[in-house]
Amino acid sequence: MITYEIPCLLGLEKLVADEIKRLGLADVRAENGRVLCQGSWADCARLNINLRCGARVVALLGQFPARSFEELFQGVRAIPWEEFLPREAAFPVKGYSISSQLHSVPACQSIIKKAVVERLKAHYGMEQFPETGTKYQIRFSVFKDQVSIGLDASGEGLYKRGYRAVGVEAPLRETLAAALVTLSRYRGRDPFCDPFCGSGTIPIEAALIAKNRAPGLDRRFDAQKWAFLPAEAWMDAADEAQDREFHGQYDIWGGDIDPRAVDIARDNARKAGVDDCVRFEVADAAQFHRDSTYGQLVTNPPYGERLLERQEAEQLYRAFGKAWRTLPAGWRTLVLSSHTEFERCFGKPADKKRKLYNGMIKCDVFMYGNV
């Protein structure tokens, strides 16, 4: 059995753990900023293709305490790297250190690299390694003097689904958008709306969830090139995911006041294969209105990080709050914002609040209705 580490944004650990449990993996444990689980090498493909809220998939090869560089070196050298890295492999090292004696990340990277090379030298009988072949990204973390080290199976982060327009930076990563939709308990039955849709990330993730479409079907992963991981594992995982897809009629809507953003959102929906069930329109959130008895509203309005922008954001929240109060009582609403005065401006205290991080920005999810 392999131990997998799924890093995630702080606050999303339970959602990621629930996703992994639904995939049937064993010994699922949520910790701060990551979830650990046990599975086979075939599960590496299943995790990468299916996870909506996790940041990446790391196959852990070693966990040990280290308070000195010598302990770090010996711990890394004890791992059977030759079972995973062919002689021509490229094996760069990335990682971080928090609350540990070994606080210098560059020094840790250097020691880890040296230890792996020494292990491979002994096995392959080579003095130098060209690193011209397939990439096997080594990832490590040192947290409170405990080292976790393994191979990054994902490559680019799992938020890169493959549908976002090149060169367009969204304020909300796809993994966090999927988490917000999941928190709203949307399952595809009721109307779903995002009146500040921007490039369409939240409505597109809602459509993928409604269709039960795996988010990783349209991209590549680093581990697909690993010599020890059979290609059939990826084909089987993709087939399994496609067999679970739903085909129905969905009422998913996104609006934005910026026509260019709406054009990008429509293009992204087409690339994601959900343009048949998501409508995007140029619309003013201050005029938002719906008559249906039930529905979900999930949105990420502008925060306004600078003073003038904050004042504009507050005016926007007031206007949106006034429109929102016309919604029928059966609607569930989730608003992600870092603005400390959101509830006052919106005009109603949240029924529930949940702390999340949007990248490095500390935010609250303000929840209204039966959430």
Report residues per predicted region.
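SAM-dependent Rossmann-like transferase core, predominantly class I methyltransferases
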Residues: 149-185
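C-terminal catalytic and target-recognition region of SAM-dependent MTase-like enzymes
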Residues: 284-287, 291-371
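Conserved S-adenosyl-L-methionine
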Residues: 172-290, 305-306, 310-314
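A short, flexible beta-alpha/helix-coil linker loop
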Residues: 98-101, 157, 302-306
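Non-catalytic nucleic-acid substrate-recognition regions in nucleic-acid-modifying enzymes
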Residues: 1-134
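C-terminal edge-of-domain segments
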Residues: 138-154, 366
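Short beta-strand/turn micro-motifs composed of small residues
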Residues: 8, 256, 337
